[in-house]
Amino acid sequence: PDKINFYSIESSNKICDLNISDYNSEDCKYTTLKRSELVKFLKKDLENVIKINHSISKIVQQNQKIQLIFENNETSECDHLIISDGVFSKSKSLILENQTPPRYNKTLAIRGTIPISQKINCRNISLFLGPDFHYVIYPVNQNGDLNFIAIMKYKLNKEEQKNHSLFNDANFIKRILDKVPIEMREFLNQIKKLKIFPVFVSKSFFKTKNNNIHLIGDAFFAFPPSFAQGASQSIE
């Protein structure tokens, strides 16, 4: 992409644009792709190093050494431990007593893939801003497929927050999509691989007592998405 174009959902008018090609160099350029494809690229030379289907059951800190004990009784010792397993970090819970759980941010994320559209500049990133609803559309391959990510304000009671199967329920999904601004219904009618999930955020920062243990990403602190921040982070 050469630009990020900002639009108003209510008026469909363009607000402004940011020419990101100004930040490109010959060997380092802005690009957009699916997160899953990025993960495949990053791990392609690490297949023999990454342990699949391993779950940590205990973290033992002894002086400057850290021992990991897995549920299959395997052990591993390291000098430094980087924890990056998301907002509901199991690893963080193993080293932190009385952990404050993340809170629901009264926000839902909607994600999927849509086909090429005459109404969208398919070469660039399009960011649409509206009251209680933002969404971003950007190209992910040379075939014209577009990634769609939206952030919507939506209240869930405590039972609904815990009910993971709710987000696969056809009636619930329809209820969510019916609240989407009418200006973008056309995109949702063509969306594939639709996923809807609640957004949880952190209440406080946590610093480990051991300087050899480092928390990063949402495991360290999950920020609330605002002004499509969550969608923008997905682009990055």
Predicted segments — roles?
Residues 77, 145, 211-212:
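Conserved catalytic motifs of the protein kinase core domain
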Residues 53, 62, 131, 140-142, ...:
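Structural motif
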